[in-house]
Amino acid sequence: MYKYLQVGKIVNTFGLKGEVKVIPLTDEVDRFSELEYVLLEDNLSTKLTIERYRVKDNIVIIKFKEISSIDEAQKLKNRYIVIERERAKKLPKDTYFICDIIGLEVYDLDGRKLGRIKDVLKTGSNDVYICDSYIGKKDILIPALKEIVKEVNIEEGYMKIKVVEGLLD
């Protein structure tokens, strides 16, 4: 498991006083109101204190206390902001962070290894796990539904699924 979780990617500056535009990598954008600070993923010793934030067109605009000019903000462009796992919001039962799902080995209920999760698609109704198939040439798209996903073991690094008709075609 990762010690740090990505909460956003800084994509641009905003204005002249050091604000930045952030694409949120969290389901709950209001989560930023609970965060006192974030860290830069590529330099964990850099702590950025959130002075204020607002949401505009699905982009979070953040003013960090330590950044006061557009030139300083420009240096943050294309960098990820993270928080320590222990500061993350507690997830409900049978809910997982995407970073913990990616990389899991996928088995059917008979123990046959089907592949490895390489990405997660966010859809309107449920997530879809993209599995790099070991048994064929194309990816396996696994709906994240209780009827399909029967067991997830993050610590052991696997997921067991019920193979329904058409899933492996």
Swiss-Prot record:
Major localization class: cytoplasm
All copies of domain PRC barrel, residue ranges: 92-167
GO MF, one annotated term: ribosome binding
Disulfide bonds: none
Cellular localization per UniProt: Cytoplasm
Gene Ontology terms describing biological process: ribosomal small subunit biogenesis; rRNA processing
Keyword Cytoplasm: yes
Homology family: Belongs to the RimM family.
HAMAP family the UniProt entry points to: Ribosome_mat_RimM (MF_00014)
Record function comment: An accessory protein needed during the final step in the assembly of 30S ribosomal subunit, possibly for assembly of the head region. Essential for efficient processing of 16S rRNA. May be needed both before and after RbfA during the maturation of 16S rRNA. It has affinity for free ribosomal 30S subunits but not for 70S ribosomes.
PANTHER family: RIBOSOME MATURATION FACTOR RIMM (PTHR33692:SF1)
Name the record gives this protein: Ribosome maturation factor RimM
Protein species of origin: Caldicellulosiruptor bescii (strain ATCC BAA-1888 / DSM 6725 / KCTC 15123 / Z-1320) (Anaerocellum thermophilum)
